[in-house]
Regions:
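Hydrophobic/aromatic-rich core segments of domains that either
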Residues: 162, 194-289
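Flexible, active-site-adjacent loop/turn segments at secondary-structure boundaries
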Residues: 16, 20, 29, 46, ...
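C-terminal accessory extensions/subdomains outside the catalytic/core fold
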Residues: 251-253, 257-354, 359, 363, ...
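Short capping/connector residues at structural and topological boundaries
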Residues: 23, 27, 36, 51-53, ...
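Secondary-structure boundary elements
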Residues: 86, 104-190, 271-273, 303, ...
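Intrinsically disordered, low-complexity N-terminal segments that are enriched in acidic
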Residues: 1-113
Length: 394
């Protein structure tokens, strides 16, 4: 197997056309990929139209790149366009059978563990319940046959991944972004987000650390057909803590029953989806709207970048650089179970949540920048935003 990196150009574009003007908005974006030992960012930018009243880039508590933005004046649309060139080096674990027994990892992460390493303490953040992942006996019961005594932890995780792949059906209509994992377990249907949450819940129920990974998966068009701009989708998978291995965290994709390698591009990691939603925040106004989402993953060593993806969004134009479909196109057959609907569902949740980033500019400062003839209405708006800002982010 060659160690040559595989290079990609990825464009993820989202558009909102609001039913009525949005007078105030604060948002948190997870659209920039994180640098990993096997993943290097050659070029990356996030363009936003209209231009935000303020913008700040930084890191979230999990080390992911994050962008905070706010709008203090009325606007009728929002376009977000993340474009990146990225190189992914082969990084499959050499021998998962040599990973430590799963019980030893469980004991290492236990409350009374002695002298934990800093890596172990960090992994403990992914050991407990989170917004979308509850720890239930039913999950432990489902996973226990994959973890007989003394089985290496990565072999157990691989067996659990294969079990989910075999017993569950990919069905974008079966669940929503908020469907509990016990309901997913009962229905045996869902999408990549559901399967990732389920596998994470099973591992945590056994006392093991597991985290949620968001990113992109390369899909290939049918033979003889061109790559369709916007026909790819966001994807989600799982990372399992296996100390003393070549990489302490090893990824598993239960949707496709494989260990992610050079065809998976990582954007962010968190306890579950709510930590790393591509767009999350609050708006005042806007009415009802459906997001339009287009994702295009181009392998640079095999194809040229489509011309329509090379030019950034023009600020103030209100125009995207690609025609965004009302519904995502179906992924290519080679990844038939990839998350065709996750992009839309991600943004549906972002629209409904009333949670503001912790590091937003204060509402009082925001009001100073709003036109004086609208002060009365906007003081009321500020009160709403201030109340929402008091809700802690997951």
């Amino acid at each position: 197997m060659t160690d040559k990196p595989v290079r990609y150009h990825v464009v993820h574009e989202t558009r909102y056309d609001y039913g009525s003007p949005v007078s105030l908005s604060q948002q948190q974006l997870h659209l920039s990929p994180r640098v990993l030992a096997w993943q290097q960012i050659e070029e990356q930018r996030v363009d936003i139209d209209p231009v935000p009243s303020w913008r700040r880039d930084g890191q979230d508590p999990f080390g992911n790149p994050v962008t905070w933005i706010a709008f203090h004046s009325p606007h009728e649309h929002l376009i977000l366009r993340s474009a990146m060139s990225i190189a992914v080096t082969p990084h499959l674990p050499k021998n998962i059978a040599l990973s430590p027994p799963w019980e030893s990892v469980r004991d290492l992460l236990a409350y009374d563990s002695t002298a934990p390493r800093s890596e172990d303490l960090d992994a403990m953040r992914f050991l407990f319940e989170s917004s979308h992942v509850r720890i239930k006996h039913e999950l432990a019961d489902y996973a226990v046959d994959c973890f007989p005594p003394k089985r290496p932890i990565l072999l157990g995780a691989q067996a659990l991944m294969a079990k989910i792949f075999k017993e569950f059906t990919f069905d974008p209509e079966a669940t929503t972004v908020s469907t509990p994992i016990l309901e997913v377990l009962e229905k045996k249907r869902g999408v990549c987000q559901d399967f990732a949450h389920l596998m994470i819940g099973c591992l945590r129920a056994l006392g093991l650390s597991a985290r949620y990974v968001s990113g992109y998966l390369l899909t290939r068009p049918p033979p003889g057909k061109p790559r369709l701009i916007g026909a790819d989708a966001s994807h989600a998978w799982v990372s399992v803590y296996a100390p003393d291995c070549e990489n302490d965290w090893v990824d598993f994709d239960p949707t496709n029953n494989l260990l992610p390698n050079t065809e998976h591009i990582t954007v962010a990691v968190g306890r579950d989806f709510s930590d790393i939603s591509p767009l999350r925040g609050i708006i005042l106004g806007g009415g009802g709207t459906e997001p339009e989402v287009a994702v295009t993953v181009t392998p640079l060593d095999e194809e040229e970048i489509p011309a329509g993806l090379l030019t950034p969004v023009e600020a103030g134009s209100g125009k995207a650089k690609v025609d965004l479909p009302k519904a995502q196109a179906k992924p290519a057959e080679s990844a038939e179970k990839s998350a065709a609907k996750l992009g839309e569902r991600v943004l549906d949740e972002a629209e409904s949540e009333e949670i503001a980033p912790e590091e937003m500019e204060s509402d009082e400062a925001a009001l100073d920048n709003i036109e004086s003839d609208k002060k009365t209405d906007q003081k009321s708006a500020a009160a709403v935003v201030q109340a929402a800002a008091g809700v802690p982010a997951a």
